[in-house]
């Protein structure tokens, strides 16, 4: 009996050992083709089937190496993926080692995106048209901040300077219809829909994903025009430390050699802050724990912009049918210069990722942002902003059935008026948002990507701008919304995809609203794709549009309207694209049809100017966009975009300030060797002529009439040039000139109206140095 047991036991051990004996090791080495530098953090997926079902994964180390175990016999298939590179696929033969070289994805068609569907997939396989802009490419191109980068890289986007700061518009829609997200989360602290865009650290961004059109199905009522999602970095290296500094020419020197004895010393000093930036990005990956820390400091000087001629108002017969002919009135006095504020700000962000075991991922994050804004008004005060964000996200996968994600996000923004000479400040604005979210995604059913979710948004605003007088009493207004959404992306076969979904929005103020969406993608071949999309958008009035009532420096009143109704829009688009290894082109035509669109309009009451919010009857926007990318002669890449939009008039009046035509173009040159890289970028952005009407009053024969004068702003082109050199893959030096042909706007406004113009003082040079600290330390250690 004992002998039988021994035989059975030995047989069991032999059976268990057979799989071990049938395995062999294969070592992968992944490097960049042109420089032969190791690619760290490349993901190698392998399986015993060509479709890579039920795969295993490994990640390359600091030397670009990873080892896998494969069967002694039979085929094994692999895929290598790394951000910014073309993926590699192949079959593992009898070799015990493989050295593979990856090439840069200059066409950007293999980027993995999440914004359009909230599920990760390569951009070329997404049913929703998505533009991806790499963060590294923006820094290398010499852009100083996010607004300059988006203006140049995004077709149809217009970022201009107005009285309260920057103003963004896209496809004829202003910032109230463009939802900015950071890692998928909302932000607060906006003015007329515009955030403090200085809070976005360009050096902390991994990529930017832009989805145009009504995206309300997944992102709610603020996404009726577009979604811009800033995805921040997450290091894949054991140690990753980068530090840099950027110096730029001053726009204008307002005060030479200010003395500390001067009564206005702090004002003079703040007005002429240096155009200086510095940053540190540090992270580590220790297996189960990954940390990412980013710190950014920036300052810029204040300057004046001057109008070449006196104010001119042209009252056209088209906008004022009661006139017998066009009337032109020219001011006898010169227009005062327009001041552009200087800023000084610092931002700090921290993310910690913890993966305790295979199916669980935990993220905790927080950030802080402080900004001083220095105007050129000698009133002994300046504006100060403070923002805190914090949140957590937990993701758990139940086998291959479904994945559940729970998150909490909060953003806390304050604005102050601070005294220049004494340590005293007064809070004038407090905004808080809190958003819990729960979602379930599943790929259990073959060909289907399902997502189901529910979220709640609590928005509280405290300000002294609800009173209608100069009492400065702080009051609080709130809006609460609860939303649920469902979406399915169905891959029918290799050629067809369908995405359909619906979102419901409920608030006590405006009741229940449902927003459907459906999108189709047809790929007749691997090079061609067609996309068609319909979606319903919805935007409820903001707290400011409902309740604001304040006097702007005695110049005019800004008045909300508690009778506002939510605006609705129907968005349709049809687009096509073609791509191969060296060429990409896409075109898209769209229509955006609004009902009860919320707009701010000027009203004149006995020469008292009011800016009031109202629902327009309807407004239609028809447009087209084209994007082209061409890589040629191994070293050159040409990029070009064009955007056209036609905005319907309201009773013959054009209140929209968007230019119908906009275009961008750039030519990039890259020369790469093992220990040296050279890159040069020449870029240009074109903005067409703008024509719009502004309400005013006009006296004719002693009788005062409501009237509209026409603003006509000329077309212009801004060009930039930057040259970047990388030495030993450790030190980057960039030299460039912004606005190289020295364009300066000549028309700034008329009357109390300030036009949206590019805030530039002319051609300015900059120098930037960035050091890969961890690579330098590693090199020094090797020498020892």
Each predicted region: which residue ranges?
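C-terminal beta-signal and adjacent terminal beta-strands/loops
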Residues: 306, 638, 686-697, 724-784
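Short, acidic, small-residue-rich periplasmic hinge/interaction motif at the N-terminus
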Residues: 31-35, 43-47, 81-85, 93-139, ...
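Outer-membrane beta-barrel signature, preferentially recognizing the C-terminal barrel domain
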Residues: 382-397, 429-430, 443, 477-479, ...
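Face-selective signature of the C-terminal outer-membrane beta-barrel domain
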Residues: 292, 349-371, 385-510, 521-523, ...
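Gram-negative outer-membrane beta-barrel transporters
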Residues: 244, 491-494, 591-593, 614-695, ...
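Periplasmic-side early beta-strands and strand-to-turn transitions of outer-membrane beta-barrels
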Residues: 244-383
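Short acidic/polar hinge/loop motifs at secondary-structure boundaries
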Residues: 69, 185-212, 230-233
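Extracytoplasmic beta-strand/coil segments of soluble accessory domains associated
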Residues: 130, 147-189, 206
